């Protein structure tokens, strides 16, 4: 996860992970490129400074600008897909990541209410081990309560999306190292009756939130500290 005020720091002082660990993050880059070339230049510098193996990105408004940016960043490649409203994708280090496949899921009309932006799967290898990454940008907003059965309720739509994703992973990748990440637009600290992630939290032997300590910690470390909110997650 990356804080929205990361660029205010000295990028030369940023350090994450090691050369022998799979280092990844999720980043809503907000209507990319929101400020045109200034955004492209800033995002490029941040990517190179962080040296992540994989970055899952959301809110790509211009996929052409995204592709052009990726061509200018040494040692990195990217994949983005624009749906009806804002795109998502992955940025990855070509020296450490080998791509097996990239594809969308839940594109049929029956899933549109739960997935306004179709999740993207990246089937990849890192150090000869296979990993499945699924980037998401779930429906936003709501009132903090799950109105069960109400297909217009934002929390219900997110809860259903999470349940569908879990079933997909359990069925399609029962033994693979699978990671669900992205802007999931809800809190993991809500009470069980209002928690859209409860189906995940109820299965601790198979799933955990890598950012759980961030979510329960001070708001200054949250993914959107100026709101403040922590709606971006990595589920392993």
Language model: regions and residue ranges:
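Divalent cation-coordinating acidic motifs and surrounding scaffolds
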Residues: 4-236
């Amino acid at each position: 996860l990356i804080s929205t005020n990361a660029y205010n720091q000295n990028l030369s002082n940023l350090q994450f992970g090691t050369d022998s660990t799979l280092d990844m993050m999720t980043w809503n880059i907000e209507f990319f490129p929101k400020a045109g070339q200034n955004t492209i230049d800033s995002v490029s510098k941040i990517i190179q400074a962080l040296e992540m193996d994989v970055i899952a990105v959301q809110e790509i408004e211009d996929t052409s600008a995204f592709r052009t940016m990726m061509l200018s960043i040494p040692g990195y490649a990217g994949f983005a897909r624009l749906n009806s409203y804002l795109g998502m994708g992955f940025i990855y280090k070509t020296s450490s990541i080998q791509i097996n496949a990239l594809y969308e899921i839940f594109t049929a009309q029956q899933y549109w209410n739960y997935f306004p932006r179709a999740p993207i799967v990246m089937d990849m290898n890192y150090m000869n081990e296979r990993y499945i990454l699924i980037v998401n940008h779930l429906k936003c907003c709501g009132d903090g309560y799950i109105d069960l059965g109400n297909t217009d309720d934002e929390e219900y739509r997110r809860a259903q999306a999470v349940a569908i994703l879990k079933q997909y992973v359990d069925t399609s990748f029962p033994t693979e190292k699978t990671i669900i990440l992205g802007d999931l637009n809800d809190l993991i600290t809500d009470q069980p009756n209002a928690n859209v992630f409860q189906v995940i939290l109820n299965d601790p032997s198979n799933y955990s939130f890598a950012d759980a300590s961030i979510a329960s910690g001070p708001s200054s470390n949250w993914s959107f500290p100026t709101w403040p909110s922590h709606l971006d997650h990595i589920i392993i």
